[in-house]
Amino acid sequence: MDSGNVVVCDNGTGYVKCGFAGENFPTSVFPCVVGRPLLRYEESLQEQELTDIVVGAACADLRHQLDVSYPVTNGIVQSWDDMGHIWDHAFYSELKVDPSECKILLTDPPLNPVKNREKMIETMFEKYNFAGVFIQVQAVLSLYAQGLLTGLVIDSGDGVTHVVPVVDGFSYPHITKRMNVAGRHITSYLVDLLSRRGYAMNKSADFETVREIKEKLCYLSYDYKREYQLGLETTILVKSYTLPDGRVIKVGTERFQAPEALFTPELIDVEGDGMADMAFRCIQEMDIDNRMTLYQHIVLSGGSTMYPGLPSRLEKEMLDRYLDVVLKGNKDGLKKLRLRIEDPPRRKHMVYLGGAVLAGIMKDAPEFWITRQEYQEEGLACLRKCGQA
């Protein structure tokens, strides 16, 4: 089977990344949104003809005429009907494939309900009639993209952040940590912060604009208190941004206040540990033989780890915790700890890249895939092939 017949699809909360096995970057990346027209005009407001359902990037251009819904929330598919439209768009419009002649590798966030995975596999066989399917945990794929089999993956996308220890290609679900703070929540928090500054922002209409502000201007402070003090006493942090309608707004301390929610989720009323705490606790809960290896291979993955300053902040916080909890303040022990955080430049699509690598290697290995025949004979029991049924 040639690589053109193996589809890799990473459906995230914010974007769907899809393409073919063995590729170096996704053929298509489009927002995971579905829009339905609010008004049925005989003549539409713009030149663009409104079809019944709009998927992906087209929603952004027409968002004033659409009721927009997001089928995936926090990495879990909530609306299977909408997800069907997204997959239709991916397979038929973007990749232009005939599913019955292809195999597909799908990705699944760790700690996702088994029901989600069952429904996914059911849809792939019953609706699209794929020849073979495999579902892999996202964190493991991120490591494959780095050429590793053992490491601690910190994956933060648009809807969910998780920290997963992987040893020899197997993840540990009982030690995996998950936090429902990621890109979308930070954008939403930035909308609130800008509103407090006096700019009239709307949660839905301006969401995309604020997301662009976030991607261009936000960063993580090395020391939050000192940075905040600097922001209060000087104007050194203030940057201007021109909105699509021509207004210019000034963004100051909000630039690092918004992403701070990744480390201090209480800022947006989410209980639980921040990113550094999760990573530290995750490694300390592993058996002692694997801890040092995990400290040496902390791999960042996903779009919400792209903030400037995030790797150095994470390193600082983890060293502080190690010094405090493990070494009880004895600084000499730090020399033995080789903490290494890997932040590959293309980590935004890392799960997809790992999927393309895995699918490329396995495309001719029949024992790897769940075939249509196995599905028809065994039903959902065939999920055990994915190792997590």
Curated annotation (Swiss-Prot):
Gene3D superfamilies named among the record's database cross-references: 3.30.420.40, Actin, Chain A, domain 4
Chief location of this protein within or outside the cell: cytoplasm
Binding site for ATP: G157, D158, G159, R211, E212, I213, K214, E215, G302, G303, S304, T305, M306, Y307
Assigned keywords, A-Z: Actin-binding, ATP-binding, Cytoplasm, Cytoskeleton, Developmental protein, Nucleotide-binding
GO (cellular component) term, any one: cytoskeleton
InterPro entries, per database record: Actin, ATPase_NBD
Molecular functions per Gene Ontology: actin binding; ATP binding
Subcellular location(s) per record: Cytoplasm, Cytoskeleton
SMART domains: ACTIN
Subunit structure: Component of the Arp2/3 complex.
Function, as annotated: Functions as ATP-binding component of the Arp2/3 complex which is involved in regulation of actin polymerization and together with an activating nucleation-promoting factor (NPF) mediates the formation of branched actin networks. Seems to contact the pointed end of the daughter actin filament. Regulates the directionality of cell expansion by regulating the actin organization, and thus the microtubules distribution and the fusion of small vacuoles.
Family: Belongs to the actin family. ARP2 subfamily.
Record protein name field: Actin-related protein 2
Source organism phylogeny: Eukaryota, Viridiplantae, Streptophyta, Embryophyta, Tracheophyta
